Amino acid sequence: MNASSRTKPAIDLNKVPPIDHHRTAVTFNCLIMKMTEMLNNFGNKMEDILEKAEQSLDTADRKLRLMESKLAGMSLEDKSTTATPSSAPEIDEIHESNPSSSQIVEETVEEKPEEHTTTVLIKDDPAYSKYFKMLKLGVLEAGVIQKMKSEGVDPSILKRGDEPSRPQAQTSRNYESSGESTASFSDSD
């Protein structure tokens, strides 16, 4: 057996009737439609998975920022608590000599933790970060401003993105004072 006998068919092609072109076209169309449908289904499933992953990352990021701000507040409280016992004998000595001056010293000790609190920028504030993210994703600024107005948010915040977010600092203090924690948040959304 030589190589040419392997490539030649054993059937005489002149005796075989031609294949119907219409039937061939229909077969290829069905094949292409099924492949397209399978690829679309796969793409839709992967898009859903990516959206869920992005949402879980966003919630994890928000929780992380809340925990960091809470921990930053706790570490400052620990420092002030550590500083208070070391200065307690001094306050007692001052209290014996002059009661009004001890009140002044205590007030200055309380003011120091407020000076060292970490501030979150407006663009990093979880309440406003979605608007800055929309701008990064290519949404027109006019559309973002309209959404902010519809949600009752001041649109001038977009211009002040690098300024510290004062409402965030106040809300984090409110959480600490009320005893609420981030453990009350759940992923059951």
From Swiss-Prot:
Expressed in pharynx, intestine, body wall muscles, vulva muscles, spermatheca, and several head and tail neurons. Residues 35-74 form a coiled coil. Residues 167-189 have a biased composition (Polar residues). InterPro entries: WASHC3. Residues 150-165 have a biased composition (Basic and acidic residues). One of its GO terms (biological process) is actin filament polymerization. Keywords: Coiled coil, Phosphoprotein. GO terms for cellular component: cytoplasm; WASH complex. Disruption phenotype: RNAi-mediated knockdown positively modulates lifespan; effect abolished in hsf-1 mutant background. Increases resistance to both heat and oxidative stresses. Increases localization to the nucleus and also DNA binding activity of heat-shock transcription factor hsf-1 both before and after heat shock. Increases in transcript levels of heat-shock protein genes sim-1, hsp-70, hsp-16.2 and F44E5.5 after heat shock, but not in unstressed conditions. May also increase levels of post-translationally modified hsf-1 under heat stressed and unstressed conditions. The modification Phosphothreonine is found at T182. It comes from the Eukaryota. Phosphorylated. Phosphorylation on Thr-182 may promote DHIC complex dissociation and consequently the activation of heat-shock transcription factor hsf-1. Phosphorylation is modulated by the Insulin/IGF-1-like signaling (IIS) mediated pathway. The keyword Cytoplasm does not apply. Residues 76-101, 150-189 are annotated as: Disordered. Acts as a component of the WASH core complex that functions as a nucleation-promoting factor (NPF) at the surface of endosomes, where it recruits and activates the Arp2/3 complex to induce actin polymerization, playing a key role in the fission of tubules that serve as transport intermediates during endosome sorting. Acts as a component of the DHIC (ddl-1-containing hsf-1 inhibitory complex) which modulates lifespan by sequestering the heat-shock transcription factor hsf-1 to negatively regulate its binding to DNA and its transcriptional activity. Probable component of the WASH complex. Component of the DHIC (ddl-1-containing hsf-1 inhibitory complex), which contains at least ddl-1, ddl-2, hsb-1 and hsf-1. Within the complex, interacts with ddl-2. Within the complex, interacts with hsb-1. Within the complex, interacts with hsf-1. Formation of the DHIC may be dependent upon the Insulin/IGF-1-like signaling (IIS) mediated pathway. Belongs to the CCDC53 family. This is WASH complex subunit homolog 3. It comes from Caenorhabditis elegans.
